[in-house]
Every structure is written in structure tokens, then in C-alpha cells.
Amino acid sequence: MYSLIEAQLLGGKLVNRVMASLRRIIQRSLGYFCALNGILDFNTDIGTGNLRRYRVLFMYRLLHNFAVISLTLKFLFDFTDHFKYIESSTLITVNFFTYFTLVFFALLSSMGSCYQWQNRILAVLKELKHQRDLSRHMGYRVPRSKQNSIDYLLFALTVLLILRLSIHLATFTLSARMGFNHPCNCFLPECMIFSMNYLLFAILAEITRCWWSLQSGLKMVLLNRQLSTVAFNLWEIERLHTRFQCLIDLTSEVCSIFRYVTLAYMARNLWSGIVAGYLLVRFVIGNGLQDVELVYLVFSFITCIQPLMLSLLVNSMTSTTGSLVEVTRDILKISHKKSVNLERSIEWLSLQLTWQHTHVTIFGVFRINRSLAFRSASLILVHVLYMVQSDYISITN
């Protein structure tokens, strides 16, 4: 028995099984979290592909979304009642009104996308399940190293969710104990926005897995030169091209469905980066901060740092998705001299992929990748320097 356990550990089978079980548990739990936050009216268990509509979830989604919108508006209107505590601080006023505006926009974009494109989201998930079943039937497998990279991102996303819920609870408790009993606690809207971001992350991760399995099938066709005929290879390349094209179309469909969600995601990341960078400078300098202002700014910093942490995970996933076509074209460069027709078929497939992409875009203008992250960081740095310079001028005068 001990030798069997040792052999499994050495071969990595036990670790792979544990990772797969943990992945299924997390995917199912996050699917329940999405349903609990009124995102969709069907089960979003993407890992198992169990996609079923429930009338109870439909009614719950209506009631939940109405309650979230009502509470968010109440928080915003009640903020004016507490304005007397911070009316002397323009910084806090601008900060909180900007925060509420971005949260409200992200909330409306999430609800609007779910209401308007409910059937399209379900169709995308069903097609991904179909693609996954086809790959399993054909014997295509995702490389273990690549599968682990997505699993690690999923685990990090789960840790971030737990941290986010803990921070919200701790912030509310500390603010109540310190006497700042303002109703500006957007707990439910924040959870709903997080659920929508996870749904986008999960769909992109599933597209990436399906694409990686097709890449493994393409390598099998190009490298397995002895055990297959030319006619079979030509037929297999044609099938692979059809499925590659399907995944490219699904990526475009996802960008169309989530265009307002990704726009709100980008706007909030910019604001969070500016506020977090500015507060770091203010804390280091330590000039001109009142006690009330300091407490509010600390809470703002905690609120702003969470979207930035989430953006690292989503940006990593979108960067991986955007590079799928380029990696596939590199695989097609493998020489194959078995047949002239097969060589031409491979060249034709490469040409078909040349003018297409799997980039995640926002309204077709902004591309979510490392280049956008660099431009956003530059914009954040410029605004932070401008705000610090304005504070310095006001202090010296």
C-alpha cells in the first residue's frame, strides 16, 4: 500500500487528482456565488457543464437586483445626510461621489448585460461544453502545466474573494466602533460586480482550455507521421480549422456581450489606481490630514486596492487568451513533407489564422493586455503627480 502511494506521488497522479477535485469544488462554489448574487437564472457550474434554467433563480434574480439597486440608491442619498461631517474636505467628497458613480455604472452594466444577453451567455456556455466534449472524444488533452496555470489563477481568485468579504466585514465593524456609522457600505453591489468579473474570467478560461486541447490535436497531426494516412490528416486539419474558427467567433461574442462590463472594469481600475497611488504619497508625506479625513482615506484605500488585485488576475487571463492565435501559427511552422496536399492545407490554415485574433477588446477600441496595463499605469502616474503638485501648491500658499 505504501509503495502504491509512493508511486502515485512520484508520478504526480495524486497531486493531479487533488487539483482536479479542488478545481471542481471551487468552480461549483463560485457558480453558487454567482447565482446568490443574481447574475444568471441558470446554474453556472462551468466545470461540469451542468447548465439548467431554474424558475426560482429567475424570480430570485429579479428580487435581488431590485434590492441591490434600491440599497445602492439609498446609500447614495443617505450620504448627503452625513455630509456635515466631511463638508470641509473636498477630497473626501470627490472621492466618495466618484466611487458611487463608478459602482453604480458597473452595477447597471452587469445587470443590463445579464438581462439583455441571458440567452447569448447560455449559448456560449453550451457551445464551450460541446467543444470540450468533442476534444475529450478525440483524445485531445490540455497539457498539465497549462492546466495548472489556470488552476492557480482560479485559486488566487478564490483567495481574493475571501479576502474581499473579510475586508468588507472588518471595515464595517471598525467604522461602526469608531463612530463613523455612515451607510456608505456597498457590500451587495461589490459582490455582484465580483460575480460578473468571475463569469467573464471563467468563460475566457474555458475558451483557453478548449484552444489548448485543439493545439495538442494539431501537434498530433503534424508530428504523428507514421500511424495516419494523408486523407485522414487532411480531414483532421479541416475539422481543427472549423473548431478554431468557432472559438474565435466565441471570443468575439464574449467581447460583444461584456463590452459595458469591461468598460466599467477599465474605468474603475483607473480610478482605483489614481486614488491608491495618491493615498500612498499622502501617507508618506503626512501633511494636512485631519483625523476624520485620514480614516475615510484609509477605508478608500482598502476599497480601491481590491479591484487592482482582481485586475491582475483578469489581465493575466485575457493576455493568455489574446496570444492563442500567435502560438498556433508557431505550431503550424513545423515542417511536414508527407504530402504536397497536406502541406498546402497547413499553409491554408495558417493564412486563415493570420488575419484573425482572440484578443479581448472593449468596443473594439481598447485591447485588454499588458500594453493597456502599461498605458493605464502611465496615466495613473501622471494624475497622481498632478494631484500631489496641486496639494503642494495649496500648502505652500
Swiss-Prot record:
Residues 78-90, 173-186, 290-293, 397 are extracellular. It is a multi-pass membrane protein. Probable gustatory receptor which mediates acceptance or avoidance behavior, depending on its substrates. This is Putative gustatory receptor 85a. GO terms for molecular function: ligand-gated monoatomic ion channel activity; taste receptor activity. Its main location: membrane. GO terms for biological process: monoatomic ion transmembrane transport; sensory perception of taste; signal transduction. InterPro entries: 7TM_chemorcpt. It holds the Pfam family 7tm_7. Keywords: Cell membrane, Membrane, Receptor, Transducer, Transmembrane, Transmembrane helix. It is found in: Cell membrane. It comes from Drosophila melanogaster. Belongs to the insect chemoreceptor superfamily. Gustatory receptor (GR) family. Gr22e subfamily. One of its GO terms (cellular component) is dendrite. The chain crosses the membrane at residues 57-77, 91-111, 152-172, 187-207, 269-289, 294-314, 376-396. Residues 1-56, 112-151, 208-268, 315-375 are cytoplasmic.
